[in-house]
């Protein structure tokens, strides 16, 4: 289990990005109010369908939709071999409560950009 460490991108010079090769189950931290982007680079030969699950996420109310069960986590769309997927973590903050686990991304490379 690897920890995906954010790379702070606020700089006047170049920034080296800390990439993590994903395993069966990886973790990362999220703090509401920060601007973080999760980037998954599918360097594998097949499609991946990652899932992000905060173990403290239960339900959330969304206007126009109602109460939504968050316990299964947030499943990303299929990421084809060679594609790069970027997710603004603020958009799924309700799923990011407690310990956050990323599964389904085996052998892909991931990093978090903090801007």
Annotate each PLM feature.
Residues 2-115:
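Surface-exposed, low-hydrophobicity beta-strand/loop segments enriched in small/polar/acidic residues
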């Amino acid at each position: 289990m690897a920890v995906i460490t954010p790379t702070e991108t606020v700089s006047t010079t170049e920034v080296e990005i800390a990439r993590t090769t994903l395993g069966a189950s990886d973790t990362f931290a999220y703090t509401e109010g920060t601007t973080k982007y999760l980037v998954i680079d599918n360097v594998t030969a097949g499609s991946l369908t990652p899932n992000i699950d905060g173990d403290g996420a239960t339900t959330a109310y969304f206007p126009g939709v109602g109460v939504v069960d968050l316990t299964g986590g947030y499943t990303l769309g299929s990421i084809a071999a060679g594609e790069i997927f970027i997710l603004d973590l603020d958009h799924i903050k309700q799923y990011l409560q407690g310990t956050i686990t990323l599964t389904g991304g085996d052998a892909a490379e991931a990093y978090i950009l903090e801007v």
